[in-house]
Amino acid sequence: MKPGKPLAFGAVRRQAASGAQASAPSEGSSAMEAETFFVGLPGNPVSSFVTFLLFVRPFLLRLGGAHDVAPRAISLRADFTQAKADRRNEFLRARINAAGGLELFPNQSSAVLTSTVWGDGLIDNPPNHAISAGETVRFLPFSELLG
């Protein structure tokens, strides 16, 4: 995905301290084991922001007992052309304009954090897909991603 690499996720199993309360055992583990999860986010600020919103936040919500953690996307008109298709799923910073369509932040570099302040959300652009003006695209509002 772009922006958002590299992303690391894992779990470390450890023996619970004597007398300590262990978490509920998962399949194949004993009651005396506990799991600690870790996430490694990318170094560029926009990459970290996007991967946190799409992967880490939903994971933390699920750990907290939430069930419906998937953000609801809306379909909006692209008022721009993105001729260069990327081989990866790309999340473009965009905002809703006065006409109700979407406009792109001019610089989609993962180092430009101001694109996240300027924008209203992310366009979820599938791999190898160029966007034409007037096309309907999948938009994830920050209000959905941030809760």
Question: Where do the model's predicted regions map?
Answer:
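Flexible glycine/proline-rich
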Residues: 1-147
